[in-house]
Amino acid sequence: MKRLLSLLTGVLVMTGLLMALIFPQSAYANVSDDKLGDRGEKVDLNNSSVRAFRQFPGMFPTIAGKIVVGGPYASVSDASSVLDASQKSVFDKYKDNFTVTDQEIAVNEGFDRINDGQYR
């Protein structure tokens, strides 16, 4: 009986290893990876975290926080509606670096867009 269980366990392990080789890793990709790949080099106003705005001087954290909390947006120019006059001028300076795609729940769940847990 012990040999039979050992044999069955070995067969199951080998089957699992073979299945991992047969199915490509792209089959395991999740929605978040697809969404983040869609936007290219631009920052997606509907799906990016506040941290993504650090590359634009003057936007992190105040303007970025307002944009993240104020979404979703239909177009890039809609994001300026949550900003005051001085913040709009900073936003307009970097406007070409932003894009808008449909919101994805996997990226926007909870407070992950405010604090995505990336620390130095």
Swiss-Prot record:
What domain of life? Bacteria
This protein's major location comes to: membrane
An example GO BP is: photosystem II stabilization
Q: Where in the cell is it found?
A: Cellular thylakoid membrane
- Please give the InterPro entries that the UniProt record associates with this protein: PSII_PsbU (IPR010527)
> What is one term from the GO cellular component aspect held by the record?
extrinsic component of membrane
According to the record's subunit comment, the protein's assembly and interactions are:
PSII is composed of 1 copy each of membrane proteins PsbA, PsbB, PsbC, PsbD, PsbE, PsbF, PsbH, PsbI, PsbJ, PsbK, PsbL, PsbM, PsbT, PsbX, PsbY, Psb30/Ycf12, peripheral proteins PsbO, CyanoQ (PsbQ), PsbU, PsbV and a large number of cofactors. It forms dimeric complexes.
HAMAP family (alphabetical) = PSII_PsbU
The protein here is known as Photosystem II extrinsic protein U
Q: What is this organism's lineage? A: Bacteria, Bacillati, Cyanobacteriota, Cyanophyceae, Synechococcales
Q: Which gene encodes it?
A: psbU
